[in-house]
Amino acid sequence: MIGVRLKSDLGLLSFVLLIFLLPSSAMADAPLLAGAAALEITPVDDQGRLRQEPYEDRNKNGRYDAPDPDRPRQRGEPFTDLNGNGKWDGPFLAGFFHHGPYYTATGVHDPLWARALVLEQGETTLAIVALDVVGLLYPEVAQIRERVADLGLTQVIVAATHTHGGVDTLGLWGPNFSIDGKDPRTMEQIRSRTEEAIRRAWAARRPARLSWGKGRPLSRFGILINDLRNPVVIDDELRVMRAEALDGKTIATLINWSPHPETVGAGSSLITSDFPHYLRKGIEEGGFSVGWRRAEGIGGVAIYLSGSVGGLLTPLRIPIRDEEGEPIPERSWSKARRIGEIAAWTALEALRDQPPRPIVRIEVRSKTLFVPFDNPFLRGLYEKGLFQRETYRDGKPAGKEGPDLLTEVNVINFYGEEGIAAQFITLPGEPFPETILGGHLTEKKRCWTYTGRKRELGGSGRERIGPAHPDIAPEPVLGEKMAGDYRFVVGLGNDELGYIVPANDFVPPRLKPKLRYGADRCGDDDHYEEIVSAGSRMAPRVVETLVELLK
């Protein structure tokens, strides 16, 4: 069905829902074509130096000091405003939402990438792009789609790996909460090179076959994913898809896993994609060992997609071991390497002996929806101009005055001869693992208990089991609605609206006398995720919309 457009009853859903059932091939004999490409998006100039405007380092601290509206005497250091936008533009590092001094990059540990895969079958041509950035807003994705409109693509999925070692692409990590941290030159570089990566992947299409796999990284080397927020639900399954040419050579390998790419922590000032760098390199080139077995690379372009990173799944605060069984230092490059290589080994093993599966049809389903923007902290930053996007009221553009944000979700079905073989869903932010796997907080009377799983993760064993709002029902579990043997969850897909916090546990931040996490009825004041979430009703809207698409 082509070009179907429906409009929901506003009285029933209280927001406009646009449904696009995008073209899909019904011809079982249509050949599958695949092409891939990778281009660097590291913010450096032609000489390989970090891109930044010249400034006078008067206090010799090695970084630019900006004016602070809360400290009138801090006027800021002189700089050359090359683009005339009234602020210093440089490589502000993004990801760690701290309240201390901002920090800028001082060098590059490994390059950042735009990695694209284009799949075509019959009337459907799909582009999937992964960017080594903390996130990309929906209006930026729209610009990229416009630039490649002439290719006639059915859909373009642009997802962020969510690395915490890249530069600010949202505007939230500038020198203070009044100055946008994005560099216009870097943003244009990301747009243009993402466009070029898609074009190169499209031009490289050739007959291909798909194979699939899944696995869990070997636990004998330590727990690789920690869960810092109750309930403890860890999505540790690694999903992988390989596109190979008819001669058996790899075109691309797509990997989907869930820990935050933040292994080296906030102490590093070097640009990095974190463990995905080692994961991708390991799949492409091999040359590492896990369990004293040597890995052989399979070539092609490795593409990493973050999954259910919210809630909060991280490689921090947990020990892992090397080949000798020795602990690896926390927040280190060696830990990032080890995690990436174990994940690469898992992906390679998952693909071993997996024959290509015939794919008779690719179907793409997309819906736009409106998410209430009711986080008072982010709303205040938005009104200051730290990030730019339209708001909406009753489905119509409303400048900065509307209560809603426009975003999008997608479902991609890969049909085999016996039905759906693999399925992808995209979410416009950081989904909690319980949204995918179940295990929401539901206890109405008790708040706390003691569990072995919290002790395993290095805690005291005390675990909260009561939600902040016990009278609010949890959202449906998306994993139970999905189909196929291989179920890919793409977080930060086409947008970054922050953490998609289950509505029954959303506690807004406190703004006075200073910014603090909210506290719930159980006395738990570790509600960090709500500070960087669009709002309290995002999870129900996103989940309900995806459930409709999955029917």
Question: How would you name each of these model-derived features?
Answer:
Residues 24-28:
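Sec/Tat signal peptide C-region and signal peptidase I cleavage site
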Residues 1-10:
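N-terminal secretory signal peptides that target proteins for export/translocation
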Residues 29-160, 167-338, 351-551:
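Conserved beta-alpha junction segments in alpha/beta enzyme cores
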Residues 11-23:
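Bacterial N-terminal signal peptides
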